[in-house]
């Protein structure tokens, strides 16, 4: 019998010979991980056996490169993968850990259908805690805070985090809250925003997290940005990033000039509605932005050149300025999710 496919999708993989990062189509099986240059390829470029392997997450071997996980095989070979965003990395980590555990116990991989309890166990589930903190009704309130002639948008204070943990009886005292907050910071669930919090996170203070009203933090997908004395051009540019992130992930995008298809990381924001796309293996600056206000988005069954495509799950965005963009999702379900999310965003704000 063929090993069962547990999870598949685009991740950015570090080359084993050269220090290059490239997007790959990654398939998690019950006994290993296969990775392909393209989703449509039949033969994998490589396979990582999971038996006896160990998983490290978060992996902070690469400085600013976030959402990285490391798999070390029994032959002490390290394999590094980078997800597009935090929840995606956590989903891969959960399934890989479970697959390794099933191999060790001689069991078949099976997902539990029981709903996850929101009440945190003694061993704190940081992923569940993070989701509770982000709850629009009962979570930590995101604020616009001012310090040293700068305005920090969509953030909160270190003491505010501890207050929230204590008031929700998730910790017994502020000292315990400090330990949990430091763990959230090291796992990437919280990010330092102000100079004070950044210096502490870099090891200048005794504790990486500060129970301090002047230490500012933010959620990694919150739409955080900082304003200071800046030119009109900077303000216009920042306007694009004010919106709250409502969806992100990797898609194939067709280039406008060469018409070739490349994997791009997309971040969808609403109010104002923008879809930014990035090189998934590259830096923090977007390669481009699609203004979605008043756009039309539809699924298409053929390539832009009119030929019937072998590739499935294509969709098209036509902006208000009549610029056409073509993308390809990995599955029909994913295409539907993106189309619906873009339609919602296109009706909001500016």
Curated annotation (Swiss-Prot):
Residues 4-101, 244-347 form the PH domain. This is Pleckstrin. GO terms for molecular function: phosphatidylinositol-3,4-bisphosphate binding; protein homodimerization activity; protein kinase C binding. PANTHER family: PLECKSTRIN (PTHR12092:SF1). The modification N6-acetyllysine is found at residue 64. SMART domains: DEP, PH. The modification Phosphoserine is found at residues 113, 117. Keywords: Acetylation, Phosphoprotein, Repeat. It comes from the Eukaryota. Major protein kinase C substrate of platelets. InterPro entries: DEP_dom, PH-like_dom_sf, PH_domain, Pleckstrin, PLEK_DEP, WH-like_DNA-bd_sf, WH_DNA-bd_sf. Residues 136-221 form the DEP domain. The keyword Phosphoprotein applies.
């Amino acid at each position: 019998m063929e090993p069962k496919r547990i999870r598949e999708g685009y991740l950015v993989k570090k080359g084993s010979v050269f220090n290059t990062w490239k997007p790959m189509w990654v398939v998690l099986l019950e006994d290993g991980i296969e990775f392909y240059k393209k989703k449509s390829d039949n033969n994998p470029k490589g396979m990582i056996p999971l038996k006896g392997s160990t998983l490290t997450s978060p992996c902070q071997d690469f400085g600013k490169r976030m959402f990285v996980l490391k798999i070390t095989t029994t032959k002490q070979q390290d394999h590094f993968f980078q997800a597009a965003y935090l929840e995606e990395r956590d989903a891969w980590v959960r399934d890989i850990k479970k697959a390794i555990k099933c191999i060790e116990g001689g069991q078949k991989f099976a997902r539990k259908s029981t709903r996850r309890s929101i009440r945190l166990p003694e061993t704190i589930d940081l992923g569940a805690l993070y989701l509770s903190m982000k709850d629009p009704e009962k979570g930590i309130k995101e604020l616009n805070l001012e310090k040293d002639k700068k305005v920090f948008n969509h953030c909160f204070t270190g003491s505010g985090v501890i207050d929230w943990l204590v008031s929700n009886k998730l910790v017994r005292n502020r000292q315990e809250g400090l330990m949990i907050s430091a763990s959230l910071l090291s796992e990437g669930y919280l990010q330092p925003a102000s100079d004070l919090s950044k210096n502490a996170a870099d090891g200048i203070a005794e504790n990486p997290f500060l129970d301090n009203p002047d230490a500012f933090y933010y959620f990694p997908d919150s739409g955080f940005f900082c304003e200071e004395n800046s030119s009109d051009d900077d303000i216009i540019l920042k306007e694009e990033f004010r919106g709250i992130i409502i969806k992100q992930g990797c898609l194939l995008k067709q280039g406008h000039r060469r018409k070739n298809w490349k994997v791009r990381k997309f971040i969808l924001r609403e109010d104002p509605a923008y879809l930014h796309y990035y090189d998934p293996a590259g830096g923090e600056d977007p390669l481009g932005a699609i203004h979605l206000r008043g756009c039309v988005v539809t699924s298409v069954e053929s390539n832009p050149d009119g030929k019937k495509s072998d590739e499935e799950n294509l969709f098209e965005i036509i902006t208000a300025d009549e610029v056409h963009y073509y993308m390809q999702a990995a599955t029909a379900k994913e295409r539907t999710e993106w189309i619906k999310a873009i339609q919602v965003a296109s009706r909001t704000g500016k």
